[in-house]
From Swiss-Prot:
Residues 23-47 are annotated as: Disordered. It holds the Pfam family SRA_like. Residues 38-47 have a biased composition (Basic residues). Although this protein associates with the 30S subunit of the ribosome it is not considered to be a bona fide ribosomal protein. This is Stationary-phase-induced ribosome-associated protein. Belongs to the SRA family. Associates exclusively with the 30S subunit; there is 0.1 copy per ribosome in the exponential phase and 0.4 copies per ribosome in the stationary phase. InterPro entries: SRA-like. Residues 23-37 have a biased composition (Polar residues).
Amino acid sequence: MKSNRQARHILGLDYRISNQRKVVTEGDTSSVVNNPTGRKRRADSQK
C-alpha cells in the first residue's frame, strides 16, 4: 500500500480517513462529503 499512497491521496482516499469521509472535486472546488458506514444506532431507526 505504501507504493500507492500518493495515488490514494490524489483521489481523496487517504488511508487514515478513507472510512469516514470522501473528498469530491468538481471543477476547481472541492468539498468533503461524510460517508457514514457501520450500524446506525439511532432510536428512531428501529422498526
